[in-house]
Curated annotation (Swiss-Prot):
InterPro entries: Cyt_b6/f_cplx_su6. The keyword Cell division does not apply. It comes from Humulus lupulus (European hop). The chain crosses the membrane at residues 4-24. Component of the cytochrome b6-f complex, which mediates electron transfer between photosystem II (PSII) and photosystem I (PSI), cyclic electron flow around PSI, and state transitions. PetL is important for photoautotrophic growth as well as for electron transfer efficiency and stability of the cytochrome b6-f complex. It is found in: Plastid, Chloroplast thylakoid membrane. Its main location: plastid. PANTHER family: CYTOCHROME B6-F COMPLEX SUBUNIT 6 (PTHR37266:SF1). The 4 large subunits of the cytochrome b6-f complex are cytochrome b6, subunit IV (17 kDa polypeptide, PetD), cytochrome f and the Rieske protein, while the 4 small subunits are PetG, PetL, PetM and PetN. The complex functions as a dimer. This is Cytochrome b6-f complex subunit 6. The keyword Repeat does not apply.
Amino acid sequence: MLTITSYFGFLLAALTITSALFIGLNKIGLI
């Protein structure tokens, strides 16, 4: 159970970072 919780927590963090990075690059105008 702890492993699954840690996995989902890591997945959520990675998704949040990726989204923030994509939005940041989009605002700058690189994409």
